[in-house]
């Protein structure tokens, strides 16, 4: 069936600093999002594009709350949730 409500894709631009991706992953873990895949581009001008697909069916918070928590991470330049 249509399970588009079960998964979400997070597209973020991350500074190429140690710990930024793990901070992002920690937020997803805290939210109860189940990470299905992670794709990270080679950094250009110290910024890497990251795409994370997550299962959100069991998530404890809303997508908007998740977006807000990711935006607050030091080293996250931009984030879009689709």
Question: What are the language-model segments listed below?
Answer:
Residues 1-82:
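A conserved regulatory-domain signal marking ACT and ACT-like small-molecule sensing domains
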């Amino acid at each position: 069936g249509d399970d588009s409500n079960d998964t979400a894709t997070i597209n973020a631009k991350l500074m190429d600093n140690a710990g930024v991706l793990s901070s992002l992953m920690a937020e997803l873990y805290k939210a109860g999002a189940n990470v299905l895949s992670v794709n990270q581009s080679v950094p250009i001008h110290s910024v890497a594009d990251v795409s994370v697909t997550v299962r959100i069916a069991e998530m404890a918070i809303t997508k908007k709350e998740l977006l807000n928590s990711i935006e607050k991470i030091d080293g996250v330049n931009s984030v879009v949730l689709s």
